[in-house]
């Protein structure tokens, strides 16, 4: 029986884990039509709510005692601070050296406080005033290539974009962030 499956995916999952997963799915269920929506929580949650998405793969919603969606953790991965190769801070070895940096993050606004807590406050750092949120990985890549902004990418995305996009993972001593991926 043919059917349709609508899936929301975060940009970095779309570039790393989605292609082989889709190939395996298509081998087992070739008659099912797939529809993909790229987006963070702000994009996928309304579609999950109205039923136009069957599920999403990405960062889980912030912890809440009353969650409207059931989510199952799939895996976690570490992240890295990235910049263009010739960035003035490309050689920095500590997050403290990045306290005055300008950031562009491909993260959902709902995650902003937990990001600030996990990345900056727990290390005794002040939260930078210039954390820009971008709802597009293409926007982040463009800004990283042509400005002095920094970003944080999960390692699987670092591995597929560094050479191609002329980016550099800063050799920091600290662990930057652990990203949980759930369905």
Regions found by a protein language model. Give the residues of each.
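Beta-alpha-beta core module
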Residues: 64-72, 77, 138-183
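Secondary-structure junction motif
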Residues: 59, 89-93, 101-124
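Hydrophobic residues within well-ordered alpha-helices
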Residues: 7, 47-49, 98, 142-148, ...
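Central regulatory/effector-binding core of bacterial HTH transcription factors
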Residues: 2-63, 133
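Acidic, Gly/Pro-rich loop/turn segments at junctions of secondary structure
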Residues: 28, 39-101, 157, 174-177
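Conserved functional loop/turn residues at catalytic and ligand-binding sites
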Residues: 33, 47, 51-52, 73, ...
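Ligand-binding cleft/hinge of the Venus flytrap
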Residues: 21-28, 52, 113-127
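Thr-Gly-centered strand-to-loop micro-motif
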Residues: 83-84, 106-107, 129-130, 153-154
